[in-house]
Regions:
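Bacterial N-terminal signal peptides
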Residues: 3-17
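C-terminal PAP-associated
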Residues: 21-470
Length: 470
């Protein structure tokens, strides 16, 4: 394990630990022995890449972790269906399934052609797992209806989808997310909040709230000038919702939105730090979405990929991306950007697509932070030479010092399904805390040609690791 101080760009090697997690069922081809196989793609329909799973989200409560992901990714939009997998032993073993009554490829079949953008949350008050996604009626038109599938048996099964908001004419719903208020002392305990944007109306934000375990949803009032392509809402211990968003072409920085009335109304935007990012090579589909979580004391931590610390003079601006961090106590005021010192500033390593989790049993100077990300050892690579790996950074002192390790890789970007925006591992992935351990869920693969409509071409699946902290 490599331990680094956040205030220094010097790496101090003090020993290496091998973290292992057992796999459930037959191991996927080429899977590393220290990873658990979360799920594999069973679909063989025409029009999608087979044996592909991308874009996993995950959430945890107690000793249970649930992950949702696209299964059978297509070139134009979405996937054959949304899969889920559940672990009741902190990520050691997994049991998977696929949502019913969603797409025409589901069992039983549903009405949508594809599904995309999966996210998952647990509602402790009502004892319900909620898997949210976009149901896409036709491709290549990518938008669709926002829906949630419910599980009342601890993610052993999921029911038919409940539509949160159907997409209307001249709308393009995209980049949804979901979170639930699980603090028993919160005045809004049991509220769940769903978010998405409308690409046909200047990326206007939409929020919706459920207070009955996802059975019914009511629309929130969001300022008419809102503009963002996705983001991650979190909930402070007192019930305030803080929604950090990615504005794309709207502004030069992230923005946050606040609800203090249980999701009835939102105020904002509040300015977050500016973005300074570098495009990723290797024909890989990468966005600069923020990832946020909150500690037990109510501090919000938001991470993203940023190259501001790789500026070495004229002609050498923004050479490679780091993972950076900003914090807030109220969602309105944000700290200066801090570089997570994964590698020296002079290195050629490019880091991107980060996700953060904070152990809710910790806070402040003792907060346990887990950040998972993808990286290239050499940023200036191409489709044939880019070596993609999964990295993990952890801190047990609120971000003052960090321990670094590699979880998986290297992979070639060409092993992953090609989309209209490049080869895809996902626009996001995630990590959760279970019993004080970090459990990231991510996409791995082995060599394949990933030709469209070729049943045996790809070898891409979801995997996890269980990582003790401290």
């Amino acid at each position: 394990m490599v331990v680094l101080a956040a205030t220094s760009s010097v790496m101090l090697l003090i020993g290496i630990d091998a973290i292992a997690a057992s796999s459930s069922g037959p191991r996927a081809p080429g899977a590393s022995s220290n990873l658990a196989v979360v799920s594999e793609d069973p679909y063989t329909n025409l029009g999608t890449y087979h044996r592909t799973q991308v874009e996993p989200d995950s959430s945890a409560f107690g000793s249970t972790v649930v992950s949702v992901f696209q299964s059978g990714r297509s070139y134009h939009c979405g996937a054959s269906n949304i899969g889920w997998s559940v672990s009741h032993d902190a990520g050691a073993t997994w049991t998977d399934g696929f949502l019913p009554s969603t797409t025409i490829h589901a069992t039983p079949p549903g009405a949508w052609k594809r599904a995309s953008d999966p996210a998952v949350a647990y509602d402790a008050k009502h004892g319900v797992w909620l898997a949210e996604a976009i149901g896409i009626p036709s491709c290549p038109f990518a938008g669709g209806d926002v829906f949630v599938s419910r599980s009342t048996d601890d993610a052993q099964t999921f029911g038919a989808p409940v539509t949160i908001r159907p997409q209307g004419p001249h709308q393009l719903f995209d980049k949804n997310w979901i979170v639930c208020d699980n603090t028993a002392t919160s005045p809004y305990y049991g509220n769940c909040y769903a978010s998405w944007d409308d690409g046909d109306h200047h990326l206007r934000l939409h929020m919706s709230t459920s207070s009955d375990g996802g059975l019914t949803w009511r629309k929130a009032i969001v300022p008419s000038g809102s503009c963002a392509l996705g983001g991650t809402p979190v909930i402070l211990p007192g019930g305030t919702v803080v929604f950090s968003t990615f504005p794309v072409d709207c502004t030069y920085g992230f923005q946050s939105w606040i609800s203090t009335d249980g999701g009835a109304t939102y105020s904002g935007p509040f300015d977050m730090p500016a973005i300074d990012g570098r495009g990723v090579h290797g024909k890989l589909r990468v966005w600069q979405f923020p990832s946020s979580d909150v500690d037990g004391g109510g501090t919000v931590y938001t991470v993203w990929a940023d190259c501001r610390f790789r500026d070495f003079g004229p002609g050498e601006h923004c050479l490679h991306n780091d993972i950076v961090l900003s914090t807030s106590r109220d969602g309105r005021h944000w700290s200066h950007v801090m570089r997570i010192p994964i590698d020296p500033r002079s290195s050629s390593v490019d880091h991107f697509l980060p996700a953060i989790a904070v152990d809710p049993a910790t806070s402040g100077a003792s907060a346990h932070l887990a950040v998972v990300y993808y990286f290239y050892p050499n940023a200036d690579c191409n489709l044939s030479t880019c070596d993609l790996s999964v990295g993990f950074a952890s801190s047990v002192d609120g971000g003052r010092t960090w321990a670094i390790q590699q979880l998986a890789g290297p992979f070639r970007t060409s092993w992953f399904p090609l989309t209209t925006q490049g080869h895809m591992i996902g626009d996001y992935f995630s990590v959760s805390f279970v019993d004080g351990q970090a459990v990231p869920v991510f996409v791995v693969g082995t060599e394949g040609t990933c030709e469209r409509k070729a049943v045996t071409s790809c070898n891409v699946w979801t995997a996890s690791a269980t990582i003790p902290m401290g």
